[in-house]
Amino acid sequence: MRPAFEPAAGLGRAHPHETTPRSIDADVAIIGAGPVGLMIANILGLQGVRVVVVEKLTQIIDYPRAIGLDDEALRVFQSVGLAEALLPHTTPNHWMRFTLNGKCFASIEPRTDEFGWPRRNAFIQPLADQILYRGLERFDHVSTLLGHNVDRFAQDESGVTIDATDAHGVRTTIRAAYMVGADGGNSFVRRTLDVPFEGRTKPNQWIVIDVRNDPIGSPHVYLHCDARRPYVSAALPHGIRRFEFMVMPGETEEELSKPENMAALVRGVVDDPDKVDYIRQRVYTHNARLASVFRVKRILLAGDAAHIMPVWQGQGYNSGIRDASNLGWKLAMVVKGTARDALLDTYTMERRAHARSMIHLSEVAGDIFAPTSFVGTRVRDAFVRCFDVLPSLKRYFVEMRFKPMPRYEDGVVLLARRARSEGMLARLIASRGHGAFGRLVGLMSEKRESLLGRIVHGRDAQAGTPVGRMYIQPRVRVADGSIVRLDDAIGNRFAILSWGTDPTFGLTPEARRIWSALGGCFVLAKPDPQLGFRDDVPEDVIAIGDVDSRLRDWFARVPESVVLLRPDRFVAGMCSPQCVSECVSQLAQRLSLSVATGAQADDATFAPAAGLVGA
């Protein structure tokens, strides 16, 4: 990675105190060096895409915002080769416990690891962001411009022109084929594009207090549903604890930040408030907003620039990383000429609906934890008492069965397009944002396969299909006998994975040409004891052993035995071994594939195991 004042390789150099204007050419310009912008830059960097990251601050933000990292986000860190560097700064299996009147009435503690990582993890965000930033040092074709403010930008039919100025008044003009606005909730890019950012702002604020030398020491995160002043107590890595207290009417940040008032806040939580080692405190407001579109021609929005949500489920950070995972490989294909830019339309199709669901999830968690009215508090308390007599309801809650998992019904998935229900009940549910109960019902109805989902939206013939969902990541054995996670075994690329049969048998020359253009691979999964037998494995097929029988169990639950995987590890399609060629052709259409010759395919090859997102 080039330093802030140095353009990408081959584009000339500039002294940090140079006073003459300069120009930089790139494939993609990213505005904002937060976690989403940095992750996209790493994904594109691994694909050889020329990237410029522009950040108005002179350094990466060093104070923590997010504290929760889920399994999907860790899988994306894995895909860019940075998961192992991040792990020392995480606490796996970080449960969330709700308490009322001193009693824990629910503990969210999912114990599955279907995507290869623990589902809930605490982490230190500034250290994660630094890992992403240092990860860019691997790429001579990625440059960063810290301390540069974007003054204006304009797009035309062939690209985007960006004018940025540093603290010395030196202007830099960037010309890029595409631009990504990852510049936060108050996004200059989104506001300049005049993209509506609809939603609501909670009336109450919260003060966040981070302390060193954890004065409590107990693990996990506790949400104390105290009617007088709800508060959060979260254990974080490296002896850090976070407290969050609701700001009551009439209180101000200035007053609460005084040492004596912070001591008063923590007095009921710690033994000695005078011995607390404070790091920092900040007051923030909960917002729930969603951009109407994520793409405007050659400019795309990601992360908080596209959606912001309350913190209660820790999904703001994770949703942004999902954006990066979805967008990165698509941008790489388009700028390399492998696909037409119609592929970028699928970014909004696939990500916006799930971002909306995560906003609803976060709001519902907030409704349970901190109702904004006396009536809401009473309803919450009655709901909690139901847990004692309805264990199935409690299990539904504590196992996070309510969490909407990404499911793409349109975009780069081989599913029949169908109209959604527009009946009276569906329209009523669409107005769920007008009350806590409505939001809860609306959230539960978003799972189409659930009873409530069927009542609201009608029977979903595709509810049980894995197509459009993230694929599992079990441990597998590779040819040298080592055991690795699935994504590390097959590389960061498209993959055709079959169970027990050669995925290339009967493949037409046209299908092979398409798959070669995509840089895809072929994978044969076997029961682990059979891995030593190679006579049934062609040279161009990767054989893997199913160490824990998870692949066998997965295929046993579906009617087809061949799965087409995208670089972000979502299932693009499924078929029988005799229909692979047809599925490949259909996938090429959904990808808006433009590569037509072997020569072009050579330039479009996707990186192996250390490479792109979620492979």
From Swiss-Prot:
UniProt keywords, alphabetically: Aromatic hydrocarbons catabolism, FAD, Flavoprotein, NAD, Oxidoreductase
Any one GO MF annotation of this record: FAD binding
Swiss-Prot/TrEMBL GO biological process terms: 3-(3-hydroxy)phenylpropionate catabolic process; 3-phenylpropionate catabolic process
UniProt xrefs under Gene3D superfamilies: 3.30.70.2450, FAD/NAD(P)-binding domain
Superkingdom of the organism of origin: Bacteria
Entry keyword NAD: yes
Entry-linked SUPFAM superfamilies: FAD/NAD(P)-binding domain
Coiled-coil stretches noted in the UniProt entry, renumbered to this chain: none
Pfam families: FAD_binding_3
Keyword NAD: yes
Residues reported in the UniProt entry to bind FAD: 27-56, 294-304
Pathway(s) it belongs to: Aromatic compound metabolism; 3-phenylpropanoate degradation
HAMAP family in UniProt: MhpA
Alphabetical list of PANTHER family matching this protein: 3-(3-HYDROXY-PHENYL)PROPIONATE/3-HYDROXYCINNAMIC ACID HYDROXYLASE, FAD-BINDING MONOOXYGENASE
Function: Catalyzes the insertion of one atom of molecular oxygen into position 2 of the phenyl ring of 3-(3-hydroxyphenyl)propionate (3-HPP) and hydroxycinnamic acid (3HCI).
Similarity comment text for this entry: Belongs to the PheA/TfdB FAD monooxygenase family.
Protein name in UniProt: 3-(3-hydroxy-phenyl)propionate/3-hydroxycinnamic acid hydroxylase 1
UniProt lineage: Bacteria, Pseudomonadati, Pseudomonadota, Betaproteobacteria, Burkholderiales
